Structure formats: structure tokens, C-alpha cells
């Protein structure tokens, strides 16, 4: 019998492992603006490289497909070759023996359909579409398109006030985004090619820590235009629109239903994540522009909306998604069952709950659920659990929020779907009954749960918080004539509100009524992030300005520092730390500890200044962009 031995890892295997790690980092840092067909080609060539060669369709078909796609990327293919490529891809997909062949071919077919306009441009115009061109990844992926390299360079120079002014050129909530932004700007940071993406949010937080938003001078307001703009909703989107419209010289009135400004970043985010005094700094900075009049505790119904549309030159509706969705299960009317959105809203006005000695169950897996469970811990709950019908990896909450909740003692009960709420004799909730789930087929990009053949679970609970989504209060605005669908107002790309002809006729309004109404933020997109709401407010202000016959240009008055040589040595990423869990879970004080000056300077030094190096380069049929 032949003896067995443990084969040592070869040097080639180690080198290949290192190469694959580099390849993964390159994919992670794929810049925006690349030709999608070129990306398809990269994927297809990788599939051809991986083929084992045992089946002809995969072994011979994939290299042929790669050659045909290369012709198309180089703008040398005609329509007939595209059709031959499609037919060959269908054959490879249908006859390959393994996933390498049929998945590679299927991905190509999906790409040809998804990027049909790009294919047509390569064939008929012999160039990529105008939307293709290397851009600065962080600035492109920021919904508000903040000039990230510029303010990082200003922080590196120690000009913290200049950095805040640079941020405010596109985003008047620098402090909010320094503390609670989901930082999509970091997704494709080119620094990933070397080590890890920059901690952009942490640098912004550091800048706002050293130059408070209400102490940094605001830009000078442009000459008055005599035009009036009404903003319905004093949240991040509404206040952003008000800020930019006022800077352009328009007079703005903000109508807010609640006692205080801030919207869902005041009434939906707990103080331990975003201290209220820091939010007030941003708001004071916005109002310092002048020309903005605030009306709090001023709800807007259909009649008042009609009056605003008649009295003002433009109206921007940004009411947010301020109500919680319910669950269609028995027992939701029990005492002790609360909407997570309502609970956080009361906390926003300083009405903190007392859960001392109670068992709290939170239903949901998003950021609101994490905010609720961590709030319950601070409110003195004896036990806190999050009940979710999928896995932890499927939760939509930020991974850092999940990790922090677990560190503070929250139990994650996964693959359990709420079935009913059990009441005691006094009508109070005493337990949550759940049906076990197992992970099933992938639907809409993630695995869907299906019922598992296991007994029902009983989770004791004195308080149950429902955090399964948010809705808008659309009825008054629909009565006015604004069109809504699936709980969201409808608008075009310029955020002009779409009007419902039948609703307008029902109230005897002219068909042109509402032509000056814009809508944006969560009430138009569905619940999203603060930075997306801010971006909508910026877009609305710009388009309102155009509608009123102007084309104002705003300047923050700060020069972008020149790019400095960078040795590009690999460094670890500086993370923003939190206070120890055993300490922070006992109060509502800020949990994050901002970077030190040394940490911030090191992190700023990692910036590759993509605004100066590597932007605009092109090849093949790609158009040169400056």
C-alpha cells in the first residue's frame, strides 16, 4: 500500500494566492465611469482562463466569445458580429457541463441586454457613450458629489475651517455626515489597490470636531432675486434646498410639522450616535446664510398646499418617511407594542423610555432596528434581542452597527419570522411567537427565507418594538394633486412632482396646477440615507433656480491645495473607535471617539489625490475627459 504524505504548499501556490488577492482588491476598487463592455470582457477572459477543457463549448467557446467581445470593445464589430456572438453565447450557456461555462456565457448575454445602448454606440458611432469616462471614485459615489480629495487636502494642511467650507459647497450638513453617513464614497476608493480605502467619514468628523459648523463663516448670499420658495419639511433634504436656494438670493420659508428642525436625523437617530447639540451646529450654520424663515409646528394639508403653490414661485416637498410600517400578525394592539419610528421620534423631543428590568424584543434587521435595540439597552432593559427572519449577513444594517449592538449585550435571534404577539390577562404583551425559517432561493439579489420544519419558538418579551420599514403621510398631498405610487411621490429626474389629473379635477384645479412643485428625499425615493436626502435637496434647489430663470454659480471661496508627491507606501487604515461597551451602554453620550491629530494626518496622507492623478485617462473608443 502506497504511503500517504502531507504535501507542503508550493511557492507557486503562494504567489498565485498573492496575485488573486491583488486581483480582488483591483475589482473592489473598480473605478466608476468604466466602459461596461470592457468590464464584461475582463469577466469573460477570466472564465476562459478557468476552464478545465473537458467540454468543448466551454474550452473552445469562451475564448471565441472573448475575441468577439474584444472586437466590440475596440469598436471594430458590426451588428452581424454582435448577433453571431449572441448565438454562440446561447449555445455555450445551454451545452456547457459546468458552472464556469454557462455562468460566463449567461453573464455575457445579460450584459448585452443590460447595456444595449452601449453596444449600439460601439457599433454605430465607434465610441463609448458620453457617460463613460474615468472620474474621481469618492466624489462620484457621494450622492451629493462633495469634493472629497479637496477637503482631505485642506485637513492635511491644518485648515479645518476651509475643509468645512469645502464640504458645505455641496453639503450643508458636514457634522451629520461626519457622524452618521453611510459613506458610499469609500466603496471604490483607489487606495484599496494598495491597502484599504480611506476612512473618509472619520476625516470629516475630525474636521468638524476642530472647526464647528456654526463657527465657520458661511458663503456670502447672492443679491436678492425677489423670488419666494416654500419648503415643506425641515429635515436634511428640505433644509439643504433652503440653504442653497437662499444662497442664490431667493427668499425661503420652511414649514415644519414638529417642534424642532432636523427631520429624521433628529427624530430617527439616537443621541448616542448623533448628539443633538452637534445637529444644532449644522442647523445654525444653515440658517446663518439669511433669507430663511422657519415655521415650526406648521402642518401642511391639501388646502394649505394649494395656497403655497399659488403664493410662492416654487414649492419643494420633502416630508420624509416619518411613520413606521406595521406587521400583519395577531396581537399588535397589545400594551407594550410600539412602532420603532414613533419611539425614536419621542426620544427626539427628549421623551426617553424607561425599560428598567424589562425584556425587549426588536423585530427587524435594519439600522432603525439597531438604533432601537441599543436604545433599549441604555433605557435599562434586562434583556434585549433582535428578531430577524433572515441571517445576520442578510441584515441591511451597517455591519459596524450590528457589531456594536452585540458588544453591548444584544442577542441576535435569526431565521425566525414573527407569527403572533402573546398577551397576558391584562392585555399586555408577554411574548413574541415566531415561525422558524431556513434560507432559500435567491430573489432580488439575496436569499429569501422559507418556512422550516421546526416547532414554533416563544420569546418572552415585556416590550416589542416593530422596526420593519417606514411610510410617508401622503394623503394630504395626494388630495392636492401630487401623484404617488407604492408609498412614494412620483417625480421626474429634475424632481418636478408628477401631478394626478383626476385629483386635480376633483378639487376643481387647472391642469397646470402644481407645475411649480418639486419633491425629493425619502418621500420620493423611499427610506434611504441622510446623504441621499441631502443630494435631493441640492438638486431641487438647482432646478428651482433654473425654473425661475436663473443660473447662479456658488463658490465656497476656498482654493484646493496642490497635490503633493506620495510615496504610496502601504499603511493600515485608521478606524474611528467607540468607547468601551461596558461604559457606553449605560448612557446616551456620544459613543465615537474622534481621530487624534496624528491619526487624522496619517489617514489624510494616504489619499492618492485622484482629482489630480488618474482621472480622465482613456483607451480604445473611450472619449478623453478633462
Please name every model-derived segment.
Residues 372, 523-551:
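A conserved FAD-binding loop/helix module that cradles the flavin
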Residues 335-358, 442-527, 560-563:
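FAD-site-proximal beta/loop scaffold in flavoenzymes
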Residues 1-129:
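Redox cofactor-anchoring modules in respiratory/redox and cofactor-processing assemblies
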Residues 45-67, 90-107, 130-150, 172-193, ...:
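Local cysteine-cluster metal-coordination motifs and their immediate loop/turn environment
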Residues 227-253, 369-377:
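N-terminal Rossmann-like FAD-binding beta1-loop-alpha1 element of flavoenzymes
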Residues 251-254, 258-285, 289-296, 347, ...:
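Rossmann-like dinucleotide-binding cores of NAD(P)H-dependent redox enzymes
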Residues 223, 228-232, 280-329, 420-432, ...:
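Feature captures the FAD/FMN-dependent oxidoreductase FAD-binding
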Residues 206-223, 284-297, 301-302, 324-379, ...:
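Glycine-rich dinucleotide-binding loop and its adjacent helix/turn
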